[in-house]
Design a protein with these regions (language model features):
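N-terminal secretory signal peptides that target proteins for export/translocation
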Residues: 1-3
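Bacterial N-terminal signal peptides
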Residues: 6-17
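Intrinsically disordered, low-complexity regions enriched in acidic/Ser/Thr/Pro/Gln residues
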Residues: 23-88, 98, 218, 224-232
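General beta-strand structural signal in soluble alpha/beta enzymes
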Residues: 55-58, 78, 107-109, 117, ...
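Extracellular/luminal Protease-associated
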Residues: 96-138
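Ligand/cofactor pocket segment of small-molecule handling proteins
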Residues: 128-129, 133-162
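Acidic, glycine-rich flexible loop/linker segments
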Residues: 159-235
Length: 236
């Protein structure tokens, strides 16, 4: 083998190892998270392993009907307060509803407002028409019979007939918020299913997906053993 040929092979190897792995697009990440194998249970385990922090929201954060949602967060914060002055409060909670990209998940946080509804049928219908993925509320929802009838995904900690109008003041939009005990930044990935809601920090998503693939492979090997041996201990 000539020296030129050797150098060519070495150079090729160096180029292969130097070529960075192409990052997944957000759409590709969402598509993988949508897989039935990727439940919020496994995702919660993966997020905690990758980040060292809890990613699952409060156990009382539940869907109005069984559904799975996956998308990127668009946030709004409201706080308790009566409008007793002449100041104008921008309707941030409505602005994000009218401007969020299709496929987004709205995250509404009602500070000290668990007993008042952040949304009802009108807002849910608007979200559905705008092709949003769903709404997550650290607070309450109302008109749930109508929302169930149109089958728009809403995850909420409580249900209440009380309106937020006159009780809650819009504070900000597209900021970091604490929702269900978990930090949510705009564009973080949100996954909700009948078990609850999990937040995946945007920059941790690919590492989480890699771990989820390992979980799936491991569980796929365990299930036949469980069925054959009728034992969980033998499968572990």
């Amino acid at each position: 083998m000539t020296l030129g040929r050797v150098l060519s092979i070495v150079l090729s190897c160096l180029l292969i190892h130097a070529t960075p792995t192409l990052a997944l697009t957000d759409k590709e990440i969402i598509a993988q998270l949508r897989s039935p194998e990727n439940s919020t249970g496994n995702i919660a385990d993966a997020v905690e392993t990758v980040t060292g922090h809890r990613g699952w929201m409060s156990a009382d954060m539940k869907p109005l009907f069984d559904v799975k949602i996956v998308g990127k967060a668009v946030t709004a914060l409201m706080t308790r307060g009566l409008k007793t002055d002449n100041r104008e409060y921008p309707p941030y909670h409505l602005q994000i509803l009218d401007t969020a990209e299709p496929g987004s998940i709205l995250v509404y946080v009602m500070e000290d407002g668990l007993n008042v509804a952040a949304i009802g049928n009108l807002m849910a219908t608007t979200a559905q028409i705008r092709e949003l993925e769903g709404i997550v509320i650290d607070g309450a929802a109302r008109d749930i019979t109508a929302i169930r009838a149109i089958q728009f995904p809403v995850f909420t900690r409580r249900v209440s007939p009380a309106t937020s109008v006159g009780r809650m003041i819009p504070v900000a939009k597209q900021i970091a918020v604490m929702c269900g005990g978990v930090l949510v930044n705009p564009d973080d990935f949100i996954v909700g299913d009948p078990d609850g809601v999990v937040v995946i920090p945007h920059d941790a998503a690919e590492a989480v997906l890699k771990l989820l693939a390992e979980y799936d492979q491991k569980e796929s090997k365990m299930m036949p053993i469980i069925k054959r041996e009728k034992s969980i201990l033998k499968a572990i």
